[in-house]
Curated annotation (Swiss-Prot):
Catalytic activity annotation: UDP-N-acetyl-alpha-D-muramoyl-L-alanyl-gamma-D-glutamyl-meso-2,6-diaminopimeloyl-D-alanyl-D-alanine + di-trans,octa-cis-undecaprenyl phosphate = di-trans,octa-cis-undecaprenyl diphospho-N-acetyl-alpha-D-muramoyl-L-alanyl-D-glutamyl-meso-2,6-diaminopimeloyl-D-alanyl-D-alanine + UMP
One term under GO cellular component: plasma membrane
Keyword Cell membrane: yes
TM annotation in the entry: 3-23, 56-76, 80-100, 120-140, 156-176, 185-205, 224-244, 251-271, 276-296, 330-350
Signal peptide: none
PANTHER family for this protein: PHOSPHO-N-ACETYLMURAMOYL-PENTAPEPTIDE-TRANSFERASE, PHOSPHO-N-ACETYLMURAMOYL-PENTAPEPTIDE-TRANSFERASE HOMOLOG
Matching CDD domains: GT_MraY (cd06852)
Gene: mraY
EC primary class: transferase
UniProt keyword Ribonucleoprotein present: no
Protein name: Phospho-N-acetylmuramoyl-pentapeptide-transferase
Matches recorded under InterPro entries: Glycosyl_transferase_4 (IPR000715), PNAcMuramoyl-5peptid_Trfase (IPR003524), PNAcMuramoyl-5peptid_Trfase_CS (IPR018480)
Species per Swiss-Prot/TrEMBL record: Frankia casuarinae (strain DSM 45818 / CECT 9043 / HFP020203 / CcI3)
Length: 355
């Protein structure tokens, strides 16, 4: 528990104190955000706000994780390092996307094919490595079985597992990317979901199956304490960044941050065996993504729009909701989704005779 607290506090302090330094640096370098011309007119005033703030989130999370290990003397684990690999790798893809936008002074960076390739490369490497590194109990970081709150009996097989990992990682990172359209929305929502994973992973650690004396409801997962430590570091980094990203934002996380956070969620879900539970915990990300899919499909079929604009947070902006009202109400929705997801997690534990 001490390591989890240290990771969260270090990441919070690094992010909180490091972000203003990055804001000044990026302003001097001219790393300002370009704004979509077809977006809400109120967003035009945000043009030039420093972006690529996700670099601070990643660095703060890494600092929290590694310093916590240094202080506690706990060894590194395959699961924790794999999650950080995905977070950093997708952060790099997002950084390239943001950098191209800045250099070419446009709102579009990497081509869809280039971003797809980058996400696929990171995800497939994760998928290949996650089914290696068996520990003394015979557990792997990943599992070929589809998981809800723990593994089900449905397996995709060792060959298809990297493909499954890619689907989960790409879908989640793109969902967070779509949500990152209002000041503080993605950062605040991400902090809540990471907080949920701190609770889930620490609970799994306290209820691990013993090799020869498995208790009712126990969990067969590898390295849950280290996963909790990663989630705590990411949560602290998001909260520290949110201080400066809250409306009116002094800096945006950019694709650097949104892709990294989405990758972290997906990889944590895989190593904690909660792949489908992530759909509930990240309910706001799902709503935002579905709004885009519905808008595109309906427009192609009828040439009419369901929403004023997608993702759905822009719909409410164009309906003349103040931006802060949209953000706070969406945070409430996210909080309810997280609470419901944690309730499902605990109910499943009780249904297996735990408690």
């Amino acid at each position: 528990m001490r390591g989890v607290l240290i990771a969260a506090m270090v990441a919070l302090v690094v992010s909180l104190l490091g972000t203003p330094w990055v804001i000044r640096l990026f302003r001097r370098q001219g790393y300002g955000q370009e704004i979509r011309e077809d977006g809400p007119s109120s967003h035009l005033t945000k043009r030039g706000t420093p972006t690529m703030g996700g670099t601070v989130i990643i660095v703060a999370a890494l600092a929290g994780y590694f310093l916590a290990h240094l202080v506690t003397g706990i060894g590194f684990t395959a699961s924790g390092l794999l999650v950080l690999m995905v977070m950093t790798g997708l952060g790099l893809v997002g950084f390239l996307d943001d950098y191209i936008k800045i250099r070419k002074q446009r709102s579009l960076g990497l081509t869809a094919r280039m971003k797809f390739t980058g996400q696929a490369a990171v995800a497939i490497v994760f998928g290949l490595l996650a089914v290696r590194f068996k520990n003394d109990a015979g557990l792997l970081p990943g599992s070929t079985y589809i998981s809800i709150v723990r593994d089900t009996s449905l397996s995709v097989g060792i060959i298809a597992f990297p493909l499954l990992a890619w689907i989960i990682i790409a879908a989640t990172s793109n969902a967070v990317n779509l949500t990152d359209g209002l000041d503080g929305l993605a950062a605040g929502t991400s902090a809540m979901v990471f907080g949920a994973y701190v609770i889930i992973s620490f609970w799994q650690f306290g209820n691990l199956c013993e090799p020869h004396a498995a208790e009712a409801g126990c969990y067969l997962v590898r390295d849950p304490l280290d996963v909790a430590l990663v989630a705590a570091a990411a949560m602290g980094a998001c909260f520290g960044f949110l201080w400066w990203n809250a409306s009116p934002a002094k800096i945006f996380m950019g694709d650097t941050g949104s892709l990294a956070l989405g990758g972290a969620f997906a990889s944590i879900a895989i190593v904690s065996r909660t792949e489908l539970l992530l759909v509930v915990l990240g309910g706001l990300f799902v709503i935002e993504t579905l709004s885009v899919m519905i808008q595109v499909a309906f427009f192609k079929a009828t040439k009419k729009r369901v929403f004023n604009m997608a993702p759905i947070h822009h719909h409410f902006e164009l309906a003349e909701w103040p931006e802060t009202t949209v953000i706070i109400r969406f945070w409430i929705v996210s909080g309810l989704a997280v609470a419901f997801g944690l309730g499902l997690f605990y109910a499943e534990f009780l249904s297996h005779g735990g408690g």
